[in-house]
Each structure stands twice: as C-alpha cells, then as structure tokens.
C-alpha cells in the first residue's frame, strides 16, 4: 500500500503557525492510499468499520461514527461492481482518501461547521472523480481528530482504471 500526503494549505502537519495574539493557524489535510489488492481493501475496511481492534479509537465514541454504507461487505461489493472486467496485475483498484483538518481548527467545536466541512469535502471528491466512482464514505469521530474516509474507484474520463491520472 502506497501512501501520499498532500496538504491543502500550509503549514506542514509538523509545524503550526503562531499568529499575532498566540492563535494557532489551522490547516486542511488530505491523504491518499493506493489499494492494489482486495486484501488491502478488506484490511482498510476492517479498520474503518471497526471490525478488528483499533487501539487509537475510543470505543465509547465509536457509535458517533457515520457510514454511507452499512457494512464493509457492501462497500467491497460496490468496488468490485465498478471495476472493469479485466485489470492489470499492478493496478490500483481503489484509492482511500482521508480528509481532515488540524486539531486546532475551531470548527471541530461546532457541529454545523464540522458537517459543512465534510459535506464540501465529499462534493470535492465527487467533482474530481465522478459521483458514481465514490463508492462509500465514513466519518470517524472516535479518534483524536474527526476525519472523513472515502473509497474511490479511480476511473478516468475515458472510462479506464487509472489512478495515475488523479494522483500522479
């Protein structure tokens, strides 16, 4: 599984800018993972749906998570249905996106701002990939910082499975 990080705004996740008055500047974070086998997709889904132990998740807050698809099996089925009949042996079958903002973002304290952030993130993914290629999304609220996870089949404008056209 290959992982690439792209910050939508500066600074890097390691450094937080201090503004006048001591306020910390928040930033958006976008991470992608190329999933090249059904085993990798299944492993990601088991973490995402909490069907395996997830030490970094607070089990008391897990019921606050939201999934667009009720089960990991339905997500896997949706991915398989969207894939072309034949794929290259080294093809990226699915791209897992993680979209969040830094913990300092004041929007985490406001349910309306949080909902708008995730709504706009999903709209961006659907615009970039096509709504039919965004198979499922989840919002995790049981970890340190809320985040959206999306499973996307990287079908390009020509109808070909082509992660490179989206991720480089």
Task: Please name every model-derived segment.
Residues 1-168:
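N-terminal nicking endonuclease/strand-transfer module with a His-rich metal-binding environment
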């Amino acid at each position: 599984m290959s992982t690439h990080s792209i910050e939508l705004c500066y600074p890097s996740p390691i450094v937080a800018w201090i503004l006048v008055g001591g306020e910390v500047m928040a930033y958006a974070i976008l991470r992608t993972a190329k999933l090249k086998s059904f085993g990798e997709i299944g492993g990601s889904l088991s973490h995402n749906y909490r069907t395996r132990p997830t030490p970094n998740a607070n089990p008391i807050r897990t019921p606050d998570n939201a999934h667009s698809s009720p089960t990991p099996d339905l997500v896997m089925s949706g991915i398989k249905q969207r894939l072309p009949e034949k794929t290259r042996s080294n093809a990226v079958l699915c791209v897992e996106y993680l979209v969040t903002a830094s913990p300092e973002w004041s929007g985490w304290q406001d349910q309306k701002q949080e909902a708008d952030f995730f709504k706009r993130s999903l709209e961006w993914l659907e615009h970039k990939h096509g709504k039919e290629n965004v198979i499922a999304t989840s919002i995790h609220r049981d970890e340190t910082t809320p985040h959206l996870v999306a499973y996307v089949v990287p079908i390009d404008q020509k109808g070909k499975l082509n992660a490179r056209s989206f991720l480089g």
